Amino acid sequence: MAVVAHNEKEVSLLARLMRAEAEGDGQLGMLMVGNVGINRVLANCLDFTNITSIQQMVFQSPGGFEATQYPYFYQAAREVDIRLAQRVIRGEKFHPASYALYFYNPFDQGCRAQWFGQWNSGRYKSHCFYAPTQSENCFR
């Protein structure tokens, strides 16, 4: 069962985003980026209070994903990418991105303790992930 409402176009958007942001980190890295995207749709805090769909999340501006600014994002989603997107839409979570709202690539500088006021929840390959504290009440 899906944790967010979606249509076929939005599954493809999420799949393309996951690939464009994290293909170099393999399928698990792509799933973690997908977690961040779905978390932003589910979150009721920070810059995400008015984000209610995958489409809004992918193209949020300001504060959205850098990958949408590059041609690679606009390639068709592959079947494997679509299957990965469907997994996170169904609610599968992958630590350290389980509740993360942000991630970034530190380019081997190490993960900062905080990013946009969120605490580091861990690193996977080239990406550092950042999640809100429970006291921020981001998730219903």
Each predicted region: which residue ranges?
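Bacterial extracytoplasmic/cell-wall-associated proteins, especially those involved in peptidoglycan
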Residues: A2-R140
